[in-house]
Amino acid sequence: MYFEWDERKNRANLAKHGLSFETAVLVFDDPHAISQPDREVGGEERWQTLGMAHGIAILLVAYTEWEEHGEAAIRIISARKATKRERQKYEEGL
């Protein structure tokens, strides 16, 4: 699996949410992460994943995914710390 993103969007996300996409990708290493479809935008299906990063912060990451050359590819759209309700949802799944 590989990750990509728009660097301008990464900088904007860091300024707005205090979170870089480099950190956001860590949620995909969480064996307890919860992924669900979000919505379709311009014919592109978007997903959200709630997961733990660095074992200390539960994050919500929005992204699209596809397969390229037989490998899963993920484009990060946005990332932020999970809300209280989202954290509860994650913790209930443990």
Identify the function of each model-found stretch:
Residues 1-94:
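Ribonuclease/tRNase effector modules and their secretory precursors
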